[in-house]
Amino acid sequence: MSFDLAARLAERQAADLFRQRPLLQTPQGPQVRADDQELLAFCSNDYLGLANHPEVIRALQLGAEKWGVGGGASHLVIGHSTPHHELEEALAEFTGRPRALLFSTGYMANLAVVTALLGQGDSVLQDRLNHASLLDAGLLCGARFSRYLHNDAVSLANRLRKASGNCLVVTDGVFSMDGDLADLPVLCAEARARDAWVMVDDAHGFGPLGATGGGIVEHFGLGLDEVQVLVGTLGKAFGTAGAFVAGSEELIETLIQFARPYIYTTSQPPAVACATLKSLELLRREGWRREHLQRLIARFRQGAAEIGLSLMDSPTPIQPILVGDSARALKLSALLKDRGLLVGAIRPPTVPAGSARLRVTLSAAHSEAQLELLLEALAECWPQVQADA
C-alpha cells in the first residue's frame, strides 16, 4: 500500500492551509528582496535588529578565520571550542545563573531538557498554547502529559493535584503566535506549593523584555528558586543561531550526561558563538534598541485601534491581527504585498481553527516612518477584507 501524499497535499491546498517558503534574496532587515520583489518586511523575529549588524558580521568573520568553519564533532568528543565555552559563561552571567549550556536549535534544547529530566512515572504539565517543540518533548519523554488551559493558574492547580513523580510545569515566556506573557508569578507559586519545577522557554522574551534585555524572568523579578529551567534562543533577538539552557550546576551537568539531543549532535560552528558574544555585548550596551522598540509597539497598537483592527493582548514585538478565516488572512497578506509590505498569514494547524491571523513583528531596525507605511496600508486594505466577512 503506497503513501497517498498527493491526496494529503491536495486536501491542504483546498483548505487554504498550503504553505510556501518565500525566497529571501537579501540579508535580514526591514527592506528585503523576496521572490524578486522589493518589500518592507514586518515578519522577522530579529527583534533588536542585530542579524545584519556590522559588528556581529565582523565577529563572525574573525571567528571563522581563527577557529575555522565546522564544529567538527559533538561537544563531548572534541567539538567544544573555546568560543562555545566563553559564550556559555557569558550567558550564565547574563541570566544570573550558575551555568548555561549551548544547543544548536531551540527545538533541540526543549527536547533535551524534558526528555532528560522526565520519564515513566513522572508528570509534565504544559500550557495549551506552548510551542510545538515543547509539546513534542512532552509526548516523547514518556511521562504523564497534561495540558492546562492557557495561562490559567486554577487549571494548572487542578492538574498539579493529580500529578505523580517528578513534576515539571512548562510554559512559553512569550507565546509566539499571540504575543502575550505567561503569568509567571502565579504559575510559579502554584508549582512551588506542589514541589514542582518550572521550565520557561523564553525564546521571544530575551532582548525585548526586562530592564537589561534579560527576558520575562527579569521582567517579573524572578530567580532560580521560582524558575529552575530557563531556555533561550539565539536566532531571534540575538540575531545569530542556536539556543541555550541556563540553570543550576546540577541541571546543566545532568543535561551533559543524559540529554540525547546534546550528546549526539555536532556542535554549532565556533564562529557563530563568536558572533553571539558580540551580539550579547550589543544587546547589553545599546539600551536604545529596546526603548525604540517599545515606542514602535505603542504606536502600532494606537494606530491599529484607530483603524479598528482586532489585536491580541500583547506588550511585545509580536502584534497579531486576528482575522479568523484562513482565506481572508491570505487575502489581507496579499493586499499588503501588492503595496510592498511583507506580513505572513498564520493559519491552522499553527493556530487554532477559526483564528487565522497576520503576525506583525516589529524590530528595532524599523523606523517610525516605515511603521506609518504599514498602518496606512492596513487602513486601506482592512475594509476590503471586512467586506468578505
Swiss-Prot record:
Pfam families: Aminotran_1_2. It comes from the Bacteria. The keyword Ligase does not apply. Belongs to the class-II pyridoxal-phosphate-dependent aminotransferase family. BioF subfamily. Homodimer. Catalyzes the decarboxylative condensation of pimeloyl-[acyl-carrier protein] and L-alanine to produce 8-amino-7-oxononanoate (AON), [acyl-carrier protein], and carbon dioxide. This is 8-amino-7-oxononanoate synthase. It comes from Ectopseudomonas mendocina (strain ymp) (Pseudomonas mendocina).
